[in-house]
């Protein structure tokens, strides 16, 4: 192989290695093993065995702080089962704030078509009848044929359960009770697994709901220092399946050597005192990968200096780093949130989703983009979820009784957003002007 061919091959291998590792920092990535919660995984496996293998209707509750990996933990455990053996319905207390939507998703999984125009009460009643609830007519006519349903067990994941029940109103408690009640029909296997960052949420349930959660909740434990180191090593190491065995072994040997460096270990200990969640280390991984350069002999492979430089970068203003990491669309939505507040004469610091989406966001689309090609509402809500997870916005502690998306507001200094817009080179000029000129 000529020197040119070898150089091109090495460049290709480095690019491929970068892509593999960068993908591991995405929210959709699931590791082959879940470090630090092995005991908790066995408990969830037992629940899922009942739900999927034994086709029993069951409930489970996974608790842990925001960003602790509750949803990833569930998805990791679910990987054990063949996807053709169950149906999964995912609901979110943040996104699916419309009760009818939740019911229709569940009915769809059960193979039940809901007639249009039914209110919540009649929708529940319609589903119950379809599931085999005895009516006066069926009691009289015992020859009534039972409807055949989807034989696959249905697992319903409700993420951020506390947002569904935040208002603690009777209607919301009744909604959840009625959902759980659907699992008691003999001719269907319907199980509920909920995640929440509110560890004492069971104490907030009415007695009739609390009685359903007889087993102790699964608590995601904080990661130990050793677990964090193992996870980080796994994140930046190349897999056995990597194309070039020699390149993989050299890469992994450099990773092993670097992580044993005294200075790297000390930096890990300092950072661990502040952060013990995996997503806090994704920024470090991305910074390390960004600094690798085939043509720079000092940065050709991962080494202790590159890792320590990454820690130094993280020691900058954390807010500044987070704002740099936002996508252009996320930053645009953030600017719209700020301008929604500026453009209204309301005393309440919190704004509604409609004020943002149908107000400032649509106004921006018309004024700068000359069209109404906005992101869809579910996509916008997911962006708000991400901003909430990062702590850039916060929601009111209580949702309103109608089940609308909770009001929210900026939780950081607006000046930091303006400064970030000025310093980011990837933002369109119109967005920079929108944020820096409209807000000042």
Swiss-Prot record:
Protein function: Component of the origin recognition complex (ORC) that binds origins of replication. DNA-binding is ATP-dependent, however specific DNA sequences that define origins of replication have not been identified so far. ORC is required to assemble the pre-replication complex necessary to initiate DNA replication.
Database matches in SUPFAM superfamilies: P-loop containing nucleoside triphosphate hydrolases
Compartments, as annotated in UniProt: Nucleus
GO annotations of cellular component type: nuclear origin of replication recognition complex; nucleus
Keyword DNA-binding set for record: yes
Keyword Ribonucleoprotein part of the UniProt annotation: no
Keywords: ATP-binding, DNA replication, DNA-binding, Nucleotide-binding, Nucleus
UniProt protein name: Origin recognition complex subunit 4
Subunit structure: ORC is composed of six subunits.
One Gene Ontology term from the biological process aspect of the record: DNA replication initiation
Gene: orcD
PANTHER family referenced in this protein's UniProt entry, alphabetically: ORIGIN RECOGNITION COMPLEX SUBUNIT 4 (PTHR12087:SF0)
């Amino acid at each position: 192989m000529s020197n040119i061919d070898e150089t091109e091959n090495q460049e290709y291998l480095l690019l491929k290695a970068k892509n593999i590792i960068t993908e591991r920092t995405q929210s959709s990535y699931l590791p082959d093993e879940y470090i630090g919660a092995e005991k908790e995984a066995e408990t969830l496996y037992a629940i899922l065995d009942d739900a999927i293998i034994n086709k029993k209707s069951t409930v489970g509750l996974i608790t842990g702080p925001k960003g602790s990996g509750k949803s990833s933990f569930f998805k990791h455990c679910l990987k054990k089962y063949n996807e053709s053996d169950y149906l999964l319905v995912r609901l979110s207390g943040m996104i699916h704030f419309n009760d009818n939507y939740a019911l229709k998703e569940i009915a769809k999984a059960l193979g039940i078509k809901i007639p249009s125009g039914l209110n919540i009460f009649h929708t529940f009643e319609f589903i119950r009848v379809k599931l085999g609830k005895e009516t006066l007519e069926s009691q009289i006519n015992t020859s009534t044929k039972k409807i055949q349903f989807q034989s696959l067990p249905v697992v319903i994941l409700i993420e951020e359960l506390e947002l569904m029940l935040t208002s603690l109103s009777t209607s919301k408690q009744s909604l959840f009770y009625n959902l759980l009640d659907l699992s008691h029909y003999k001719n269907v296997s319907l199980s509920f697994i909920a995640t929440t960052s509110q560890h004492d949420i069971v104490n907030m349930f009415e007695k009739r709901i609390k009685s359903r959660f007889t087993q102790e909740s699964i608590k995601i434990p904080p990661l130990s220092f050793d677990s964090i180191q193992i996870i980080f090593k796994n994140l930046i190491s190349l897999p056995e399946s990597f194309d070039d065995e020699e390149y993989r072994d050299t890469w992994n040997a450099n990773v092993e050597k670097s992580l044993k460096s005294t200075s790297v270990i000390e930096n890990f200990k300092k950072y661990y005192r502040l952060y013990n969640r995996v997503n806090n280390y994704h920024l470090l991984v991305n910074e390390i990968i960004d600094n690798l350069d085939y043509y720079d002999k000092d940065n050709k492979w991962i080494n202790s200096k590159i890792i320590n430089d990454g820690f130094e970068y993280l020691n900058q203003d954390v807010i500044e780093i987070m704002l740099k990491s936002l996508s252009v669309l996320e930053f645009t939505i953030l600017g719209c949130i700020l301008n929604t507040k500026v453009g209204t004469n309301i005393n309440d610091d919190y704004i509604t989703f409609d004020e943002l989406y149908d107000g400032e966001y649509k106004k921006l689309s018309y004024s700068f983009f000359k069209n109404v090609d906005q992101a869809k509402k579910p996509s916008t809500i997911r962006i708000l979820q991400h901003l909430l997870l990062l702590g850039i916005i916060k929601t009111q502690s209580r949702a309103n009784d109608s089940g609308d998306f909770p009001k929210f507001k900026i939780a950081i200094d607006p000046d930091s957003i303006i400064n970030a817009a000025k310093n980011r080179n990837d933002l369109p000029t119109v967005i920079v002007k929108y944020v820096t000129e409209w807000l000042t």
